Amino acid sequence: FGFFECINDQKVANALFDTAKKWLKEKGVSAVRGPANPSVNDEYGLLIEGFDKPPVILMPYNPPYYATLIENAGFKKVKDLYAYYLHQTTVYSDKLERVAEIVKNREGMSFRSLNMKKFDDELKIIEKLYNEAWQYNWGAVKMTEDEFKALAADLKPIVVPELVLIAEVNKQPIGFALSLPDINIALKYNKKGRLLPGLIRLLFHKKKIDGVRIIVLGVLKEYQKSGAAGVLFLETAQRAKKLGYNWGEASWVLEDNVMMNRSADLMNAKKDKTYRLYQC
């Protein structure tokens, strides 16, 4: 289930869920999981911790009472997702940079930014990496070529090429990281949502964007225990710093993704928000 909107009334919530469950049962569905808006590749999970922090780009937000409504409707926790906060003043350490250098030299890793002049070709590389590297993750749903193209078209206007990194070994792509400026910082100044003068106001406040969201970061399965993901994490932070970004949110990370949680810990990242997936 997804796109859940409800007043703080259990009877109303129950009516919504009962109707949805009945319809799904008629379609042969035996389990209901969510919120997914509309899938794991989009806005995912219910915010249960971190209500005092504003949502970053493409992350959901909801009233605190939603958890009670969902749980009282018979849903149980199936998985938690973490959002990590990183700041340029605390990310780096001699140990981290030393380990990163060892991994890069051992694996022969190099990094390059997205080539906007070959956007379609780059998109095919990233699509292949995404579907191969993420297929083993819990709840993974393969993205189709059309879905990837549609998402890329939506994001292209705000993409900063230097923040889209492709990791290579022997000139062969083995992983990538996609980070986007947190344009929510600027969007909040366009309260009426109008194109004009909202667009002018948005462009003016765009200068105030000092943070990014690390949306996806991963490597092919054969490199997932090599430390390559951690190196990609560090490389992203270093390039963001050169562009003047002071902080970042890495979201989201599965609670039992040991390697990614360990990488976040090595970079002194702070668990800032928790999102929950429910199932019944």
PLM-predicted stretches and their roles:
Residues 1-74, 190-267:
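Acyl-donor binding region in acyl/amide transferases
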Residues 38-40, 89-91, 181-184, 255:
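Short, solvent-exposed loop/turn segments at secondary-structure junctions
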Residues 60-139, 163:
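Acyltransferase donor/substrate-recognition loop-hinge adjacent to the catalytic core
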Residues 83-87, 166-168, 178, 277-279:
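Short, well-ordered beta-strand micro-motif
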Residues 87-91, 170-171, 222:
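Short loop segments at secondary-structure junctions
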Residues 113-219:
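A conserved beta-strand-loop-helix scaffold within acyl/acetyltransferase catalytic domains
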Residues 266-277:
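A structural motif corresponding to the C-terminal lobe/cap of the Radical SAM core domain
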